[in-house]
Amino acid sequence: MEKSYKEIMNQITTFIFDVDGVLTDGSVHVAPNGEMLRIMNIRDGFAMKAAIESGYNVCIISGGNNEGVRIRLKNLGINDIHLASPDKVVTFNEYTELYQIQPEQVLYMGDDIPDYHVMQLVGLPTCPQDASPEIKAISKYISHKNGGKGAVREVIEQVMKVQNKWHLYYNGQHD
């Protein structure tokens, strides 16, 4: 019998997120100088920081490459930022091998075809509400939120609540 997503959430030690369509809504604002700007959700950032402070691994694997994104993620305390990844499966395997993380301990949130193969390797493949149909079909949990609109916060909060760690933030013990 297959485990429920909440049973799987109890095993999660590591969160891996794509950027475009997950941490952002997938839009790119092009400035007159050609610079591409993305908008990220503050609540998603709070949740990633809370996860790190609670001992979870947080990793970013993205095909995109934007220095502003890297700076934002570094400022949140994320050290494992893999932008311009030509093959997300290879990056995932290198990351999990380096830190000796079992794939079943990983929650991966992706939104589109480039995430498909890596999502098939993890314990808990998840996606935003507005992910592509192919990604929704393989996800064990589909957020009620769209990409860039709190989907990351939702899955982190869900895992931390299942593992009885979210209350530390809710009660102000991590100010």
Q: What name fits each language-model region?
A:
Residues 1-17, 165-175:
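Non-catalytic pre-domain segments flanking phosphatase-related domains
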Residues 11-13, 56, 104-105:
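Short coil/turn segments at beta-strand junctions that form active-site/ligand-binding loops
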Residues 11-28, 119, 152:
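Asp-based phosphoryl-transfer active-site loop
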Residues 19, 63-64, 85, 129-131:
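Short secondary-structure boundary segments
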Residues 23-54, 63:
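A positional/architectural concept
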Residues 34-38, 75-76, 80-82, 89-175:
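Mg2+-dependent phosphoryl-transfer enzymes with acidic/Ser/Thr/Gly-rich catalytic loops
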Residues 48-72, 83:
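Substrate-recognition element of Asp-dependent hydrolases with the DxDx(T/V) motif
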